[in-house]
């Protein structure tokens, strides 16, 4: 029953994500392994949005290791457990909590033993900066711990890159790229070698702009209409000055109309925004507000159209709310 509910929830979240984003591009599906333990290692740029995208756009039905700090909100906590997320505690969460990680790792070993998939965001935290930060050792500990406990298993690491045209805006583009798998076929003494292999694989599939002159580079890319989610387009422009697939200029009118016809949802975000201390969570809260309240809002408009004197006015407003939501588009940033 729980698996059925999880499947239904993932379907609803997937539909909602396609309503929130203008375009979701998935590359490298042919690299998804079958019938073996998979440790999926991804970069982390957009808080809860990242795991939601991976939960809904891979057939692997993965479990997630997520920093324990996001489990504090009761509603979010229930949602996280329902979509197969497990907490990872760090020193900043308190030394006494670190011991709870062993229980989490034991749970992941059981998932992997059954040829399941576990996702870990190896950078350890999220950041909107478009480059790869140093990887933590959590995924190597998991891989070698699994091999020690179940020597007969043949786990692989699947690198995944996630890139956004505008991290904090709806109506933007997101690109998910699955890289080639990396076998865990070395002794634990070579964990550093495994880390470097995964780091190299991730850098090969994500937009990785050096810290030096970072802001100036981003500004140039946006001014020349380069797709910020495409590693190939970004590298082509930086090397040759050519723009293979310009994204065009977005005037923002569609976004303004969406806010007008979906004003109750936008107003709730304006109320919530001052309490969001970490701006990277902005997109997460916008999505959660839409996911939980958009359908009730549309049913309210439908009721106005069907059962009140407003009649055709209510129906017109409902149609415009839907249309402007699906036509919503924001510029890159």
Feature names for model-found ranges:
Residues 1-39, 52, 58, 231-255, ...:
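Membrane-anchoring hydrophobic helices of lipid-metabolizing enzymes
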Residues 5, 32-97, 270-277:
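Catalytic core of membrane glycerolipid acyltransferases/transacylases, capturing the structured
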Residues 22, 44, 98-102:
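A conditional alpha-helix N-cap/helix-loop micro-motif detector
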Residues 22, 60, 81, 153, ...:
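Residue-level signal for beta-strand positions within conserved beta-sheet cores that form or flank
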Residues 26, 73, 102-105:
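Structural motif corresponding to alpha-helix initiation and N-cap regions
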Residues 30, 68, 89, 161, ...:
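Residues at the C-termini of beta-strands that transition into short coil/loop
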Residues 97-250, 311-328:
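Non-catalytic C-terminal accessory region of glycerolipid acyltransferases
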């Amino acid at each position: 029953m729980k698996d059925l509910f999880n499947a239904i929830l993932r379907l609803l979240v997937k539909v909602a994500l396609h309503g929130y984003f203008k375009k979701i591009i998935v590359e490298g599906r042919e690299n998804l392994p079958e019938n073996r333990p998979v440790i999926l290692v991804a970069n982390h740029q957009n808080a809860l949005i990242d795991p939601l995208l991976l939960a809904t756009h891979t057939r692997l039905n993965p479990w997630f290791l997520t920093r324990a700090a996001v489990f504090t909100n009761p509603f979010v906590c229930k949602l996280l457990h329902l979509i197969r997320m497990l907490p990872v505690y760090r020193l900043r969460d308190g030394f006494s909590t670190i011991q709870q990680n062993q229980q989490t790792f034991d749970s992941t070993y059981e998932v992997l033993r059954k040829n399941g998939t576990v996702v870990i965001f190896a950078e350890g935290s999220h950041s909107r900066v478009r480059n790869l930060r140093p990887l933590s050792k959590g995924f190597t500990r998991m891989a070698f711990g699994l091999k020690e406990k179940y020597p007969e298993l043949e786990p692989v690491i699947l690198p995944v890159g996630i890139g956004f045209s505008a991290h904090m805006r709806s109506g933007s583009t997101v690109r998910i790229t699955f890289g080639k798998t990396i076998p865990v076929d070395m002794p634990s003494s070579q964990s550093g070698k495994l880390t470097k292999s995964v780091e190299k694989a991730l850098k090969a599939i994500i937009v990785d702009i050096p810290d030096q002159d970072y802001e100036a580079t981003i500004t140039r890319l946006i001014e020349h209409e380069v797709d910020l989610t495409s590693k190939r387009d970004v590298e082509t422009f930086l090397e040759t000055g050519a723009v293979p697939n310009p994204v065009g200029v977005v005037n923002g009118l569609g976004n303004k109309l969406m806010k007008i016809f979906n004003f109750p949802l936008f107003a709730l975000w304006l109320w919530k925004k001052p309490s969001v201390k970490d701006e990277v969570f902005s997109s997460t809260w916008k999505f959660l507000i839409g996911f939980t309240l958009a359908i009730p809002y549309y049913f309210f408009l439908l009721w106005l159209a069907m059962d009140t004197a407003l009649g055709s006015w209510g129906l017109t407003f409902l149609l415009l709310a839907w249309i402007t939501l699906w036509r919503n588009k924001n510029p890159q940033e």
